[in-house]
Amino acid sequence: MAFQGTSRTLTQQSSAATSDDLQKILFSPEAIKKMATECDLGRHHWMRADNAISVRPLVPEVTHGRIASFFKSGYDVGELCSKGYMSVPQVLCAVTRTVSTDAEGSLRIYLADLGDKELSPIDGQCVSLHNHDLPALVSFQPTYDCPMETVGNRKRCFAVVIERHGYIGYTGTTASVCSNWQARFSSKNNNYTHIAAGKTLVLPFNRLAEQTKPSAVARLLKSQLNNIESSQYLLTNAKINQNAHVSESEELNVESPPAAIGSSSASRSEAFRPQVVNGL
């Protein structure tokens, strides 16, 4: 039988995500909690020896069922053109190590489709990271939209799969993975350009950078000079070379207020010169 749709029906087909009912399903307090607890959206997932393989769906089972029911009910009465698709433009994972760089181990991360029993990487998008490579950013881009259906007893959707290899002798957490994505749901689908999985190695954070600036060194030297109870020695505004390895025999050039020749203050200035402490 030919489809007997109205203009309102066609408007609804353009994007089911504009429906108030669907918004309530996606952003209810329960759905938000499930996204955190079941999917680890925006949370740190610890890779341990007793959790060597982690499969995290991008949609909680309860939310998946409600979304699928919403689209199916609209499809059955002719208001929607399909039973719904899940679209994920990109999945971004931030990976950090929690053990020494000497630990021999690696992580294998990829995006899979729960409709595939083998859980193979989608379009070969898979990234391997050795422990000494971390920290790193990893990204995946699915090339198709996933139908909101049930295959056997599995709710079909995309999932992040993380495998831990090696790390002999390390039973605790060896790496932390924080994944972020934004799932979209619509009655229409598409195919997308194949892009290889991205892997960007990140320089470790230098938390001592702020403490080794010349201003910090100058403050430390000033406090040391104040301890000798000599009010005539003033730190200069000259930049301090913090990269130089200064020995105890090297002297710090300081300026003092001008004094009259032959005065007692001038003689004390020449008799005492503070030294830079090695190891600043």
Curated annotation (Swiss-Prot):
Ranges in coiled-coil conformation: none
Annotated compartments: Host cell junction, Host plasmodesma
Compositionally biased tracts (Low complexity): 255-267
Keyword annotations from UniProtKB, A to Z: Host cell junction, Transport, Viral movement protein
GO biological process: transport of virus in host, cell to cell
One Gene Ontology term, aspect cellular component: host cell plasmodesma
Region feature (Disordered): 248-267
Function summary: Transports viral genome to neighboring plant cells directly through plasmosdesmata, without any budding. The movement protein allows efficient cell to cell propagation, by bypassing the host cell wall barrier. Acts by forming a tubular structure at the host plasmodesmata, enlarging it enough to allow free passage of virion capsids.
Family: Belongs to the cucumovirus movement protein family.
Name recorded for this polypeptide: Movement protein
